[in-house]
Design a protein with these regions (language model features):
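Activation targets extended, charge/polar-rich intrinsically disordered C-terminal tails
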Residues: 128-306, 330-334, 341-368
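Boundary at the C-terminal end of the N-terminal hydrophobic targeting segment
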Residues: 17-21
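Membrane-helix boundary connector in multi-pass membrane proteins
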Residues: 314-323, 334-346
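Membrane-helix interface "capping/anchor" motifs
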Residues: 261-269, 311-323
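Sec-dependent N-terminal signal peptides
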Residues: 4-14
Length: 368
């Protein structure tokens, strides 16, 4: 690992010194590279990078702003908190392309229609971003990622910051994100219940690779298309097999078991699980720097009060079981009203129905 890091640092230093000594030629091509989707959580939304090729000077580099190190100490905790450091790296484009072909991910190239001077400025800017004081940045899901970094660097060099969202409609960030996790039900569920109010705002910025790809098709710069050429470097042959285990049907089956069995032990397990999730969401809202996690109204569904309910169920405290059940049921009703019209309402509906049935049974049982 150390050897790889040293080699990378050497290459970065070499590329920076190289560009300082040799200006690019008129034949230089600068492209925005869009990588298609994959099945892992961190690759569900694609990837963006910049490519610079100059055959006269004999180099073909990719500038990748989506680098991170899984071996980072406390990686998961830092990612959750929102202070995980991503970094930029430049390396041979051939290696970049090979790795994504191996992963069977589509690769699209959009060549930017720039003057030689603009290309030189962008090239210099890219290499400046590789300096030790600039290369690391704090990742933010919507506001600062591989796509937004590429947009920011290009916009800083070009006049009037031409890369902006053109296809603005009434869609929210959540609605833009939702289809990407189709055929990955539990990832889709997890992503939507952990995100709070911010992702329900109107999506007015470009933050996803394929959205950037689509917008670049219609963006003009100096009265001409910003993209002069689009190439399909590699078209992945991906299948989307249906998995009943990773679907809403498996969730419904599990929830039906809790409804049918209807025992004290199953109620304890059910509400403990929901309550712990709610406790986690509450903690994340306070602990994390990710603004997407703030004001998470899904806490009304995964209510931390369920943990108190579990305690009183264990103690057979009829009075408090009824009181907390009523409070939680009212909270659930408020949640349902708030959720009307939201795209993820349908995927949490089985949990809403199951929780309502079990809470109602507890209330009615105590009344009898």
């Amino acid at each position: 690992m150390t050897k790889k890091i040293l080699s990378l640092l050497f290459f970065i230093q070499f590329s920076i010194s190289y560009c300082q000594q040799f200006p690019i030629s008129e034949s230089t091509k600068i492209s925005i590279i869009t990588v298609g989707l994959a099945d892992e959580v961190h690759s569900l939304y694609g990837h963006t990078a910049l490519r610079i090729q100059d055959y006269k000077l004999n180099f073909d580099l990719v500038y990748n702003y989506g680098m991170f190190d899984f071996s980072t100490e406390n990686f998961v905790a830092k990612f959750a908190k929102g202070d995980l450091q991503y970094y930029a790296a430049a390396y041979p484009y051939a290696d970049f392309e090979y790795s994504y072909r191996e992963d069977n991910r589509s690769i699209y190239e959009q060549v930017l229609n720039l003057s030689t001077l603009e290309k030189q400025k962008l090239f210099d800017k890219l290499n400046t971003s590789l300096l030790p004081e600039n290369t690391f940045y704090t990742y933010k899901f919507i506001d600062r990622n591989c796509t937004t970094k590429v947009i920011d660097i290009v916009n800083e060099v070009l006049e009037n910051k031409p890369i902006v969202k053109k296809n603005i409609n009434s869609s929210t960030y959540r609605e833009v994100l939702f289809p990407y996790a189709n055929n990955h039900f539990y990832e889709q569920l997890g992503i939507n219940i952990i995100f709070g109010q911010k992702v329900d705002n109107q999506a007015t910025t470009i933050f996803l690779p394929l959205d950037l790809y689509d917008n670049l098709k219609v963006i003009s710069y100096k009265n001409k298309p910003l993209v002069s050429e689009t190439n399909i470097v590699f078209e992945a042959n991906r299948t989307n097999p249906i998995s009943y285990l990773d679907s809403i049907y498996s969730l419904i089956v599990v929830l039906l078991l809790f409804i049918i069995i209807n025992k004290k032990a199953t109620n304890i397990i059910y509400f403990t699980f929901l309550g712990l999730i709610g406790l986690l969401f509450s903690f994340m809202s306070i602990y994390s720097f990710h603004k997407e996690l703030f004001w998470n109204y899904n806490i009304l569904l995964f209510n931390p009060l369920f943990l108190f309910l579990v305690y009183f169920i264990i103690k057979n405290n009829t009075k408090w079981i009824k009181k907390i059940s009523i409070i939680c049921l009212l909270s659930l009703g408020s949640y349902c009203l708030y959720m009307i019209g939201k795209i993820h309402f349908i995927i949490v509906l089985p949990i809403i129905i199951t929780t309502s049935i079990i809470l109602s049974r507890l209330i009615l049982k105590r009344q009898n």
